[in-house]
Regions:
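Core segments of transmembrane alpha-helices
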Residues: 400-404, 469-481, 542
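Membrane-water interface at loop-to-transmembrane-helix junctions
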Residues: 454-476, 496-503
Length: 601
């Protein structure tokens, strides 16, 4: 008996519970466009303190559109009128059509490349693309793709004797001295006019790209000194409406959100303001250059105020993850490129984008299939749901275990040798553990979990409130146990001592089942959401039905049923006795309501 008591003190169902919770919630998350690659990722997501998020396609729609073309002197040429400036358009078309990773397919759709490439390809159109592709004079002889370090791409076309460029305006403006006018003639570049125009567009959340050409051969990792600016395009990418709300919910959950983008600072700040990331003057936006000029200690002192990192490099992501982890923060990081893989792998939770590279997906613990910040918020919510469901099971099972151990250990001192038989304790330990996991493992996600502060890394799973609930309800179950067993009042409902001990076995199980309602909510909504967790009531009534069969097995005149009754030391008792034990078991609910009123003030 002592060994059985020790076994009952341990919640063996906890590993099963954790497995069920993870399995059930990860399958639900697929409906929210979240694929969990590593189970620990979703659990950790519920503990995030800081989240570094990409901009394009995650916070913004990722549906880029060229909305304006302007000359190096700052004058805008309406897109429909660009054909009137044939020299400018011809050079611009080559700089785009031969210098992007996108193309038109057989179905006349733009494929390949990133969102920026696709927006530019749509801008020049399929007819222009076909001309550039089919005519030999436009054959590329040398090329270098865009990367986050250079911030430009280039192609050399020897037939034309030129190298064409596409990239960040500042890369050109630091070198160029010449530019085209509207007639395609080379003129002196006016820096004041163009900088004012770029800054104005950037402040309106527009991304600006520059285009140029050189009459020299291509130089690896460099723009030639004789580069001539052709012009600039402004690209718009609006903030997702649902992302704005999701960012607010994540920030209200106590999670700091930092937007990391390759855009220039003014554009990034404008997007961050639209998305609700920057709300007051204390919120900081830094460029990669400014970030790298700061020491780790300086960054740590201001980390709580950082909202934007512009012109960011992949190395900036890895550094920020390391610094935050040194501060004992739980870090989330998004990424989609090969260069993002180290940061995704190093972060506590790496969110790889569904449209990203296989290397990024392999490095991340979670794949966001639709690249949407809203889905990241859902992942955080389900992470917190998993944690809460595990806590619910622990409270449910520990009350049973505490009461079973205490009653079995001290009952002999009160003249009751074996209130719970060995088979009763095994039923409590095995059946209630396993089915309890099913009851509580599928509890629905509640938006109120997003109102809680993130958990600390070193935070104990058993809080003071949780311990108070376990001890209070365990103590009450012990009280009604001894009241039922020792008070003469209850003898009148049973004919024999065997019937009373059988009824006590039923009372113990019913009390545990009613306590299952108590642990569903820390406040008073203990019956809400049952339609979303149909398994709870199914298990509730299945256990009652199984107990009724065990208790009344002796009524069936077959050896197997008599054996079941004898094995569990159970004999049938009357309907009045059933009403009594149901009422006593139900008292677990009002007693816990009183406890909540006292402790939750």
């Amino acid at each position: 008996m002592a060994i059985v008591i020790i076994v009952c003190a341990v919640p063996e169902g906890l590993p099963l519970m954790i497995s069920l919770v993870l399995m059930q919630n990860t399958s639900k998350m697929l409906d929210h466009n979240v694929l969990v690659r590593k189970a620990e990722g979703i659990e950790t997501a519920g503990s995030l303190n800081i989240l570094f998020s990409d901009k394009t396609g995650t916070i913004t729609k990722g549906m880029l559109e060229v909305v304006e073309f302007f000359m190096p002197n700052g004058d805008t040429i309406p897109i429909d009128n660009l054909g009137l400036h044939s020299k400018v358009k011809a050079l611009l078309d080559i700089s785009i059509g031969k210098n992007t990773a996108s193309m038109f397919d057989a179905n006349h759709k733009v494929i390949g490349g990133n969102a920026t490439d696709q927006a530019l390809m749509k801008f020049i159109g399929e007819e222009t693309y076909n001309v550039l592709t089919n005519e030999s004079e436009y054959s590329v002889t040398n090329s270098q793709g865009f990367n986050s370090s250079n911030k430009f791409s280039q192609v050399e076309i020897k037939e034309l004797g030129k190298t064409f460029y596409k990239g960040a305006p500042e890369k050109f403006l630091s070198i160029a001295t010449k530019a085209l006018d509207e007639d395609g003639n080379e003129v002196e570049l006016n820096f004041d006019e163009i900088n004012e125009k770029i800054n104005t567009l950037a402040s309106r959340a527009m991304r600006v790209l520059a285009f140029g050409y050189s009459n020299s051969s291509m130089t690896e990792n460099a723009i030639n000194d004789d580069v001539v600016l052709i012009g600039f395009v402004a690209i718009r990418d609006d903030v997702r409406p649902e992302a704005k709300m999701a960012i607010k919910e994540v920030m209200d959950a106590g999670i700091q959100v930092v937007m990391i983008t390759g855009d220039r600072l003014e554009t990034a700040v404008s997007i961050a303001e639209d998305a609700g990331l920057i709300q007051n003057q204390s919120d900081k936006a830094l460029t990669s250059t400014e970030l790298n000029s700061l020491s780790d200690d300086e960054i740590k002192s201001m980390i709580k105020d950082i909202r934007v990192i512009a012109r960011a490099l992949p190395t900036d992501k890895s550094r920020m993850v390391r610094i935050c982890q040194e501060m004992n923060l739980v870090v989330g990081m998004t990424g989609d490129g090969v260069n993002d893989s180290p940061a995704l792998k190093r972060a506590d939770v790496g969110f790889a984008m569904g449209s990203g590279t296989e290397a990024a997906k392999e490095a991340g613990k979670i794949v966001v299939l639709d690249d949407n910040f809203r889905s990241i918020k859902d992942a955080i919510l389900y992470g917190r749901t998993i944690y809460h469901n595990i806590l619910k099971f622990c409270k449910f099972q520990l009350v049973i275990n505490v009461a079973a151990v205490v009653v079995s250990a001290i009952a002999p001192f009160f003249g009751v040798d074996e209130p719970l038989k060995v088979t009763h304790l095994l039923f409590v330990n095995l059946v209630m553990d396993g089915l309890g996991a099913i009851m509580l493992g599928n509890e629905p996600a509640k938006e109120k979990y997003m109102e809680e502060a993130p958990r600390r890394r070193d935070e104990s799973i058993v809080s003071k409130k949780m311990m108070a609930q376990i001890l209070t309800m365990g103590a009450w179950l012990v009280v009604i146990s001894f009241a039922f067993l020792k008070l003469p009042f209850f003898d009148q409902f049973f004919n024999t001592e065997e019937q009373k001990l059988t009824a006590y076995f039923v009372l113990f199980i019913l009390s545990a089942l009613f306590n299952g309602f108590n642990v569903r909510d820390e406040r008073f909504a203990i019956f809400s959401g049952l339609n979303e967790n149909t398994g709870f009531l199914k298990v509730f009534f299945v256990i009652i039905a199984v107990q009724a069969c065990i208790v009344n097995a002796g009524l069936v005149n077959l050896d197997i049923f008599k054996w079941i009754g004898e094995m569990f030391s159970c004999v049938p008792f009357g309907i009045t006795g059933w009403v009594v034990v149901i009422i006593l078991g139900f008292t677990m609910i009002p007693v816990d309501i009183v406890r909540k009123l006292i402790f939750n003030k």
